[in-house]
């Protein structure tokens, strides 16, 4: 598992830095303003990206008791998806990190080192 360092988006922009997704999954430190961009450069294979909910039952005064499940989204060949932001009370593990895993959509097998799935974590500074 690799830890991805979030990149700050500023008025001057940001140079994207897509990293190859790690077969065992990836993680990033989450403050609640981060989102992820995942790009599939494969010509035909699709992948399913899962963000693991660490707290599956929580309470919000306005809505009452809520149940949260993992978020899974497919990224088809040649496409990009964006996910987030991630509420820390739901998504952060004991180390304050969000956990992300990847499988092939066709057979749910774990990705291998030869896949073409890329990820970056971005955030806007909140003032």
Place the predicted regions along the sequence by residue.
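Surface-exposed, low-hydrophobicity beta-strand/loop segments enriched in small/polar/acidic residues
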Residues: 2-127
């Amino acid at each position: 598992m690799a830890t991805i360092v979030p990149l700050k988006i500023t008025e001057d922009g940001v140079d994207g830095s897509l990293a190859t997704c790690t077969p065992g999954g990836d993680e990033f430190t989450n403050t609640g303003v981060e989102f992820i961009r995942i790009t599939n450069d494969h010509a035909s294979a699709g992948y399913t990206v899962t963000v693991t909910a660490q707290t599956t039952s929580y309470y919000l005064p306005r809505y009452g008791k809520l149940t949260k499940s993992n978020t899974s989204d497919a990224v088809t060949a040649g496409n990009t998806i964006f996910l987030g932001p991630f509420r820390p009370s739901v998504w952060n593990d004991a180390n304050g990190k969000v956990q992300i895993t990847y499988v092939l959509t066709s057979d749910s097998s774990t990705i291998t080192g030869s896949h073409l799935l890329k990820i970056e974590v971005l955030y806007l500074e909140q003032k």
